[in-house]
Amino acid sequence: MSKEKIAVAYSGGLDTSVMIKWLKDKYEGAEIVAVTGNLGQKMEVDNLEQKAIATGAKSFHFVDLRKTFVEEYIWKALKAGALYEDVYPLATALGRPLLAKALVDVALAEGCTMLTHGCTGKGNDQVRFEVAFAALAPHMKVVAPLREWEFTSREQEIAYAMEHNIPVSATKKNPYSIDENIWGISIECGVLEDPMVAPPADAYQITTAPELAPDEPTVVDIEFAQGVPVALDGQQMEGLDLIVRLNELGAMNGVGRLDMIENRVVGIKSREIYEAPAATILHFAHRELERLTLEKSVFQYKRNIGQDYANLIYNGTWFSPMRKALDAFVDETQKPVTGMVRIKLYKGSMTLLGRTSPNSLYNEALATYTEADTFDHKSAEGFIKIYGLGLKTFHEVNKSE
């Protein structure tokens, strides 16, 4: 029997570190190809490679995905207004299909026979990875160690890692599970599993506690071109740099902390803590610019599309014809979404200070209540009669109702 060559989505965290050793034991003689994608998370690449090799990987591949992530994933979600259940900007969920694609690309190039990930059997990510694998490499075998192995808790994994000298940062005193990329950080496990327990200070990774944030506010001007952020405070910037800077400014001012109970793909509710300063600010600014530039029916209908798009991302069906169809609709709506939004960041809050656009549909002469008013008030009477005619007729016929 030929030996397996297994491509592992490797993060260097507890699960994937333990997983390499476990796979080596289960598939005797297997060659492990560790693949790490850079989505903007903090990491020490040299140490990561050393850790992977020391843990048992035959080779290590590091793929810089940041530019692709911003331009082909994040901006699409932002333009769509994709916030899962009106809160979560989908940082982890957005990164999974791109990481899956990177893993498949390396696996095919290296002649691997199997794909594997470090996702739990009751989480969302197993669905996201495996649905992506099915779309991109349907012929390849997939193994999910966390659904098979003997460990039933993170504490047991930590003990296993210590027994086998596997270097991991998680400890029994620091049990948080953390996933990070440039669009946000997710934190779960430990005391956070009790929805009545306020997140301890050490759970937050980048944001300042609002009460400890600067006493002076930070004002930012964000410019968009057809729905895409292109400049910050008058300076043209690449998307990656703009997000990095907004993360810094937002985090400094305590902006971007999210605490939600969300509905997972597998049917359970989970408590999630997120830090997403740039994502929170940009979604807020983008929506306000849309209010100014989109025709009423488009603006209102697009809110439904945003929810559909968020569900699609969250549920792991990024590589679907539906996403492409929604992209076409969204791109059409974004043609007039050009302009600037001014926001004040202060002690955990965002306050809209102003917005402007060459495509603004706001007509001050029609909206004003001063003598400059050009609205034809006499037209209102006839409009109201026609507008309410259906209801009037209904209630004349159905007097008891």
Curated annotation (Swiss-Prot):
It holds the Pfam family Arginosuc_synth. Its EC number is 6.3.4.5. GO terms for molecular function: argininosuccinate synthase activity; ATP binding. It catalyses: L-citrulline + L-aspartate + ATP = 2-(N(omega)-L-arginino)succinate + AMP + diphosphate + H(+). It comes from the Bacteria. One of its GO terms (biological process) is urea cycle. The keyword Amino-acid biosynthesis applies. PROSITE patterns: ARGININOSUCCIN_SYN_1, ARGININOSUCCIN_SYN_2. Keywords: Amino-acid biosynthesis, Arginine biosynthesis, ATP-binding, Cytoplasm, Ligase, Nucleotide-binding. L-citrulline binds at residues 88, 124, 128, 177, 186, 262, 274. Pathway: Amino-acid biosynthesis; L-arginine biosynthesis; L-arginine from L-ornithine and carbamoyl phosphate: step 2/3. ATP binds at residues 9-17, 118. One of its GO terms (cellular component) is cytoplasm. L-aspartate binds at residues 120, 124-125. Its main location: cytoplasm. It is found in: Cytoplasm. HAMAP family: Arg_succ_synth_type1. Homotetramer. Belongs to the argininosuccinate synthase family. Type 1 subfamily. This is Argininosuccinate synthase. It comes from Chlorobaculum tepidum (strain ATCC 49652 / DSM 12025 / NBRC 103806 / TLS). The lineage of its organism: Bacteria, Pseudomonadati, Chlorobiota, Chlorobiia, Chlorobiales.
